[in-house]
Amino acid sequence: MNFTKTLAMRIISFLAIFISSCTGAFAQNWDWGGPIDPLQAKMKIRHYRLELELLPETQSIQGSNTITFSAEEKLDTLRFQLINEYEISKVLMDGKEVKFTHEKDLLDIIPVDCTCDQVQIFYGGKNPIAQNPPWTGGFTWEKDLLDNHWMGLSSQGEGGKIFMPALDHPSSEPSEGVDLIFTAPKPYFVASNGRLIESQEVGQKMRYHWQTGYPISNYNINFTLGIFHEEKLDFTSVSGEVIPMQVWVLQENRAKVKELLELLKISTETQEKYFGPFPFSEDKIAVVETPYLGMEHQTINAYGNNFQFVPMGKVKYDWLLHHELGHEWWGNKVTVSDWADMWIHEGLTAYGDWLFFWEHGGPEAYFAKVKAESRNVPHAKPVVSPPNSTEEEAYHPEIYTKGALVIHALRGVLGDELFFPAIKAFVMDERFTYLNQVTTRDFTDFIQSYTGKDLKGFFDLYLYTTSIPKLKVSKKGKEGYVISLQGIDFEMPLEIETSEGVQRAPVGKKGIEVKSKTPPVVDPQGWLMLSR
């Protein structure tokens, strides 16, 4: 999600939760991440098979999750997370009921004496209602203009435990993907991750079976219920693969669906140019209209931006559509295991938003965007949070705009001939994608190795501190100027515009001397974050 457009909503969310708690309404904090539970560190999730009946009239769910797992040793306890708002009716292993406890959102299961690698958990109950989706998540039950039910789920800040039992930690993704089977009353449709492999009438209900073989984060497992109009096309990727591209919108918005699909196509082409082929070619490229702003759910991006298309060069641009799509590369393909490194998801995706300006609006639009966004950086926290951070601890403004400005500055330091190949090489490297989750050090070490540049000082400064170098320009003689960067012990290349033209030179605290009949303009394009 985009922070600069949502800071006010975060404040509203806080006030809403505070007021509701004062009036006795239910409010809960379901943060996730941090140090992994020692019991869960012994276990790897291979697959989830989630089978749910969605009950709009009671705003509840009923069903089961079958979890396939592996462990290097025999486990005395299987520990999963599921919020206590749901009631567990039974747990099966090897076809037999087993003992369990369900307290404080933790589900502890005592396995039977077998070589079982599966457990099926039956549960159900009223859905937790989102206080301010997607920032304070949960289920959002609304009605469309025709008085039909319309439900969306958001859980980035809460994890999967608000809708299914799971090993709920960002380091845990099912290595063999998920099967998602939803039953809903006719004529409702349920849009979800992966490909729809079967839809079946069951009396007065519809059953939809979605499937993906890709690993997927718990918060990206998602489903949206409604009566939708669908538009689709076959998208030819730069890889040569033909991928289904699908858009689902409410019936009242069907007149806008073709343009939304065309914008999705343009955004995908733009993302592919800079970051390589769409990462989930076996599934689909898709968005579904949701009763909240949006989220990067894998292969089924949530879209609630009310079709706010703006001109950009010869095309149109929808910031929400493009941003959430960008997460398919940064967040869903390249994924962190510790929320401390969350900026890799948000900063790189935000920079991809700026590249749309570069690609379609040209340099003038790009630099204007960078200048405008740079005003939104408080420099209050380091971009990278302390190790083992929770989602709430790691989610702050710096991971968005400052993260993107770090990447922008990296481009300025390296130059386009090194920068663009390096970024694409990282996102295409199998060592850092899908199940091979990454850290900030993985990224910074790779960039230095790929480019052959020593960037340790640069990365340490901008990612791990709140300090900004002080630009100092001092007059020396009639036409001389000394230019230096105070507060750093390394040099960074600066563009310097003098009466003789533009030169590029490494500058540090010792400074360099330039000759100019007019005061020099340092870093005229604004590549670096400097105190001026």
Task: Please provide the spans of the model-predicted regions.
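Beta-strand-rich binding/interaction modules
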Residues: D76, E87-L92, L455, G477-Q525
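Juxtacatalytic substrate-recognition/specificity segment
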Residues: L180, H209, H229-E328, N332-D341, ...
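Acidic/His/Gly-enriched intrinsically disordered linker/tail segments
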Residues: E346-L405, A409, V413, F432-T433
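Extended, low-hydrophobicity, Ser/Thr/Pro/Gly-biased non-transmembrane segments
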Residues: F122-F228, G526-L528
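A surface-exposed beta-strand-loop module
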Residues: T77-L78, I83-E142, K205, I512-K515
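N-terminal, polar/Ser/Thr-rich
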Residues: F26-Q62, S89, E142-W150, K456-G457
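Amphipathic alpha-helical substructures
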Residues: H396-K476, Y481
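Zn2+-dependent metallopeptidase catalytic core
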Residues: N65, S70, C114-C116, F122, ...
